[in-house]
């Protein structure tokens, strides 16, 4: 599983997405970060693949989209995921293409991945059940989740410093964007 945003944050990248793909190596693109904006992940994966290989061939948004959907399903051994067809789980999203920042719409997939973000997702259906509509998840308090997330993040940072094999201080592991006094 390739997580381009996370790997890229520390200067890493996948050697050659097109080469793996052309060699029939399954590449599944995922994310293990918050916020998990998959459109950003797809955009970054596509850019890295094109930069590393020096060509746009084999790293189109369709290629990356297939790595996200079909590649992930194959990695999990789940032929009922990653596609819309008879016998598959009805997992889908609806994206608002009318917002100004989307610009002119030519190819919907390309437009979404070039200009969109997770904030443009208006509907999410998982296994045929609507779980999010109009950006609202029934019974979920996002402010409460955000506050708990900050608490867990702070604990994670402390634990990370304890486990760091170099025993670097927090200011080295979690450098601020600008010096703070």
PLM regions and their residue ranges:
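Conserved beta-strand positions in the central sheet of alpha/beta enzyme cores
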Residues: 1-2, 94
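Short, acidic/turn-prone active-site loops that include or flank metal/cofactor-
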Residues: 3-8, 32-34
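Conserved beta-strand segments that form the floor/walls of ligand-binding pockets within enzyme
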Residues: 1, 28, 125
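Short, charged, surface-exposed secondary-structure boundary motifs
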Residues: 9-14, 38-40, 104
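His/Asp/Glu-enriched, well-ordered alpha-helical/loop segment
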Residues: 16-99, 114-118
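Active-site glycine- and acidic-residue-rich loops that bind
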Residues: 8-11, 75-77
């Amino acid at each position: 599983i390739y997580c381009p945003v996370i790997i890229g944050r520390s200067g890493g990248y996948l050697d050659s997405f097109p080469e793996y793909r052309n060699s029939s190596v399954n590449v599944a693109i995922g994310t293990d970060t918050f916020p998990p904006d998959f459109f950003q992940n797809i955009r970054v994966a596509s850019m890295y693949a094109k930069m590393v290989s020096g060509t746009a061939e084999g790293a189109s948004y369709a290629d990356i989209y297939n790595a996200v959907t079909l590649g992930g399903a194959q990695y999990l051994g789940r032929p009922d995921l990653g596609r819309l067809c008879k016998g598959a789980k009805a997992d889908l999203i609806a994206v608002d293409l009318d917002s100004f920042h989307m610009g002119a719409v030519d190819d919907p997939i390309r437009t979404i991945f070039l200009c969109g973000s997770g904030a443009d997702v208006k509907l999410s259906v998982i296994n045929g059940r609507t779980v999010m509509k109009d950006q609202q998840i029934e019974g979920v308090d996002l402010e409460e989740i955000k506050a708990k997330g900050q608490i867990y993040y702070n604990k994670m940072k402390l634990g990370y410093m304890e486990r760091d094999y170099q025993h670097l201080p927090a200011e080295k592991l979690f450098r601020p964007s600008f010096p703070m006094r």
